[in-house]
């Protein structure tokens, strides 16, 4: 199949969505599929680059988390989508919304994933106790983007449950993001100091990950 992945960031390995998109592309290629990517960055073989978009206050906050928004470009979308069998989207932002509209105009099937957990946003703006904000985001994302998709990939049962709870009627597919093959069990000597214990934490060092609670 000729599969196009649309995601704001693909080149920088600094967030979970990007890492998932890169693994997804690698695995699909290993299975013989042709994979094209549309994202921020330089163009290259099967890569269609666009510039970064800036949204004033939102961009300043997103940069602190290592995330950048991509600029929608109809010409780039049409070039990347030509001859594609399906276009897959990872996030519900203006870049993806415009791309999805173009794909449908071209008669190409689309699918989407839900990788942006609202709680990640509310924690970073220190509004984690205002539950209505998370509920509002789930419902806004549905109206703004996901309502036009029939199939949504969820990286966890939790996300699938939250989508159902917030009115998503589409077919939901729970598929783990997976782990790279480079991560394998190792035989190492365990530290046996009775006054200490080892902690392994995988993920971003970020407020919503609550590393402070783990350490306490």
Regions found by a protein language model. Name each.
Residues 77-96, 108-113:
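Short N-terminal targeting/anchoring amphipathic segment
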Residues 179-196:
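Acidic anion/phosphate-binding donor-loop and adjacent secondary structure
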Residues 105, 133-151, 166:
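Membrane-proximal helix-turn-helix segments that form the acceptor-binding/catalytic region
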Residues 191-215:
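Conserved donor-binding/catalytic core segment of Leloir-type glycosyltransferases
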Residues 1-44, 49, 82:
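N-terminal subdomain of nucleotide-sugar transferases
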Residues 41, 158, 178:
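Carbohydrate-associated surface elements
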Residues 120-144, 181, 185:
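Nucleotide-sugar donor phosphate/pyrophosphate-binding loop at the beta->alpha transition
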Residues 3, 86, 103-123, 153:
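Active-site proximal beta-strand in glycosyltransferases
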């Amino acid at each position: 199949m000729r599969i196009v992945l649309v995601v704001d960031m693909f080149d920088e390995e600094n967030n979970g969505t990007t890492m998932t998109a890169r693994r997804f592309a690698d695995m699909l290629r290993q299975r013989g599929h042709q994979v094209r990517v549309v994202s921020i960055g330089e163009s290259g073989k099967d890569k269609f680059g666009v510039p970064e978009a800036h949204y004033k206050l939102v961009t300043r906050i997103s940069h602190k988390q290592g995330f950048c928004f991509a600029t929608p470009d109809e010409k780039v979308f049409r070039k990347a989508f030509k001859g594609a069998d399906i276009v897959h989207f990872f996030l519900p932002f203006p870049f993806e919304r415009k791309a999805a509209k173009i794909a449908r105009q071209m008669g190409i099937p689309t699918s989407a994933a839900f990788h942006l957990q609202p709680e990640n946003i509310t924690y970073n703006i220190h509004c984690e106790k205002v539950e209505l904000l998370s509920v509002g985001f789930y419902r806004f994302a549905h109206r703004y983007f996901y309502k036009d998709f029939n199939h949504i990939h969820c990286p966890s049962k939790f996300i699938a449950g939250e989508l159902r709870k917030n009115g998503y009627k589409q077919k939901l597919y729970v598929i783990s993001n997976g782990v790279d093959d480079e991560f394998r069990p190792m035989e190492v000597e365990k530290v046996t100091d009775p006054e200490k214990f080892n902690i392994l934490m995988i993920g971003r060092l970020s407020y919503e990950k609550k590393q402070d609670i783990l350490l306490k």
